[in-house]
Amino acid sequence: MLSPTNSTSKTAPVPPRDSSKPVLISEEPRNQLLQKVARTALAVLLVVVTLGLILLFYSFSDLQSFPWCCQTHPSTKEQPTISIPVPLPSPPLAVPRPSTPPAPTPAISRPSTPSAPKPSTPPPLLPKAPKPVKTQENLFPLVPEQVFVEMYEDMARRRIIEALVPAWDSDIIFKCLCYFHTLYPGLIPLETFPPATIFNFKQKIISILEDKKAVLRGEPIKGSLPICCSKENYRRHLQGTTLLPMFMWYHPTPKTLADTMQTMKQLAIKGSVGASHWLLVIVDIQARRLVYFDSLYNYVMPPEDMKKDLQSLAQQLDQVYPARNGQKFSVKIAAKEVIQKDSGFSCGAWCCQFLYWYLRDPFTDALNDLPVDSVERHENLASFVQACEAAVQDLPELSWPEA
């Protein structure tokens, strides 16, 4: 029996170490070296990334303004002094002094120039004249307070007048003419729908006088009949009439008859007066006279031009409707000034008021007796308007009175 110590089992032989190949770096120091290299590379990468982010948010000019960048002078602990350049001709700026006597303040100098010591007693300098500045007061003259007071009074006056006298349309004007016919049968109440205009009033006057001459001769009339009057009644009116009140509707914008009628329709649809205006031409057949009335005096054209235009019409009427005694038609411009002051809606009422004055006394100029004050003048007109509106309440709508 064999003992354990003398066992016959074989183990692998251990090869002997080669003494000719020495070990340079052991495993543990090598790992430490790799870690140091990795940390150094990571630190360099972080620095590069940080600088890149700084360059993204700051331009090169911003980096130059930093005290640690691009400085050629040696760094000192004193902060750089910022000096403001001042033009040489200007006097030195006066620096306010505190209550306690401080050290003398150095004068402001140009950059890169040593500041000169401030003299203890500077010579007196003449004050420089200030440069004139263009302000609102220089550009626009000051408006006296009285002007604002007058403007306020004018506005208040206009409101009072507009409340006194309303705007008259063609309907109320025609009713007023019908009422005047009951007072003065020689007046023919010509329709105002559609009214005459500055472009066709001459033709309408000539046509009416030709129809009157035909009626007196017993001939049929050639002109168009009124809308709201029978043929027999119209012939009776023409036979007995001695005065034609031709109301004209005027607007400064249209330049033709068609445009005028279109503008009239548009304003009627809107229910607005706009810039429209009523004019009156009285054809006094008995006195052989044309009387023109414009409450705004020269709203349509200068009175001299209108007078020449009416004189041309008068020559035509002398041929169309000659007088037995050979008397010619004369022309008169009634208004010598603006009658309709401080009011934009009373033109129709003023035309009716002037016609009423003319019917009462055609040879007396009632415009000379008008009050100077516009409010008092329109108060008198308001009394006439109220009387007319009360008188025409019982008249039928759009119907001629029987002649």
UniProtKB/Swiss-Prot annotation:
Organism: Chlamydia trachomatis serovar L2b (strain UCH-1/proctitis)
Keyword Methyltransferase found: no
GO molecular function, one term: cysteine-type deubiquitinase activity
Annotated keywords: Hydrolase, Membrane, Protease, Secreted, Thiol protease, Transmembrane, Transmembrane helix, Ubl conjugation pathway, Virulence
Record protein name field: Deubiquitinase and deneddylase Dub1
E.C. no: 3.4.22.-
Domain of life: Bacteria
Location(s), subcellular: Secreted; Host cell; Membrane
Function description: Effector proteins function to alter host cell physiology and promote bacterial survival in host tissues. This protease possesses deubiquitinating and deneddylating activities.
GO cellular component, one term: membrane
UniProt-listed GO biological process terms: protein deneddylation; protein deubiquitination; proteolysis
Membrane topology type: Single-pass membrane protein
Gene that this sequence comes from: cdu1
Bias kind Polar residues: ranges: 1-11
Family the entry assigns: Belongs to the peptidase C48 family.
Transmembrane segments: 40-60
Catalytic residues (positions): 277, 294, 347
Root EC class: hydrolase
Region (Disordered): 1-24, 77-132
Ranges of biased composition (kind: Pro residues): 86-105, 114-130
Keyword DNA-binding attached: no
